[in-house]
Amino acid sequence: MGPTMRMTQVLSVNDLSPHMKRIILTGESLSDFPDDKESAHVKAIFPNPNLSDKKPKLGLYFGFKMFMRPYTVRSFDKQNLALTIDFAVNDHQGLATNWALEAKAGDYLGIAGPGDVKHLDINAKQHLFFGDITALPAIAATLEKLPENAIGHAYIQIPDKQDKQTLITPKGINIHWLVTPNKLTEDFLDGLKSQSNHLHDTAIFIAAEASVVKQLKSHLDNNCEYDKSTLYASAYWNQKR
């Protein structure tokens, strides 16, 4: 049995920055969507761009996975059945980017999930975040959940200074914006190296291009003492694909 699939429609589309669109989805199918899933992933199910039917096909049919892409629950308003997803968009012409760039109120999008939340211990003694713009929605959603006395650092790579967002975060969390079009930046590793090697009681979030995630994970394994049960490390995309 696969994840629950829901048909939704676009309620609104807003440009958050040059490389980020906020799309709010709605529909009666969201009536049983769970609360407290901010930062969890869902699978967006897109219409087949080669067909005239602009509704995505739901179900576990042959080839269905080619129309699915993972995204993050930015927020969910249970009362108004409004699911917010922030879409990172770039020059790459692909199924998801093309849909997001052209999305308008009334368009259809399927949603499967949600999965589990990303940050594994919001009450940890310290927090470290490393993510490019594709991970910004998950980082932003998690920062909003942290207790007021939380401390730590968030290193966020963005392609343009205009992609900076105003984040709601505890005063003890230092935000480091890494403005560079090179998504394979070494700045994440420099940020990790600037921390103590003793990272017990530290919740660590890593989400970026596959080789960057591998590099950071390797440094942790070879140089740091940390609790693997509070590490989230995921390749959100792969440059080789």
Which ranges hold each PLM region?
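Extended, composition-driven regions rather than compact fold-specific motifs
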Residues: 1-241
